[in-house]
Amino acid sequence: MNRFFLLSLVAGSLAATPAHRAVSTAAAAESEKAPMMVSFAELKWRELPERKGTQFAVLSGDPGVGQYTQMRSVPGGTDNPLHAHSSEITNVVISGVLYMGADAPSAKDFGPGSVVMLPANWVHVSGCRAGSDCVFYQEGKGKFDYKPIAARE
């Protein structure tokens, strides 16, 4: 994928989103003066403990505490059974094919450039189709959580 396209997409998303950084007052004032610019190669990826192979790179805020922006990388062939999140989440697909739906039969595929906005507590399945890993920009309006839901009968 063209890195310029990737960085333009992320930069545009960040420009439209207020930065939520956990920094001191003096540093916060300074951060308002300088843009946040990072290349894809400079991202600091960390493994998501609950989902082996899934990684994230925080851009702003803290997903363990409240509002945040981050990049996510999910291995191709990953399936997440029924679950929900406590806060609203927006995803912008960069590469791969992300799928989501109220259940597996109704799940839709979303390729590069797609925007998927999830309301808080929406019960759904999600994952990354086999063939290539999924990379997407994610913005959460509150703390990130993953609440498994018992399968519907």
Model-derived regions: residue spans:
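Bacterial N-terminal signal peptides that target proteins for export
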Residues: 1-8
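Hydrophobic h-region of N-terminal signal peptides that target proteins for export
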Residues: 10-17
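A short, N-terminal "cap"/entry segment at the start of jelly-roll beta-barrel domains
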Residues: 21-68, 151-153
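Short acidic-glycine-tyrosine-enriched beta hairpin
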Residues: 62-64, 104-121
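Conserved short histidine dyad/triad with adjacent acidic residue
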Residues: 68-84, 119-121
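Glycine- and acidic-residue-biased ligand/ion/polar-headgroup-sensing regions
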Residues: 75-77, 85-103
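Short beta-strand His + acidic residue motifs that chelate non-heme Fe in jelly-roll/DSBH
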Residues: 80-82, 100-101, 123-130
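Ligand-binding loop in jelly-roll beta-barrel domains
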Residues: 120-144
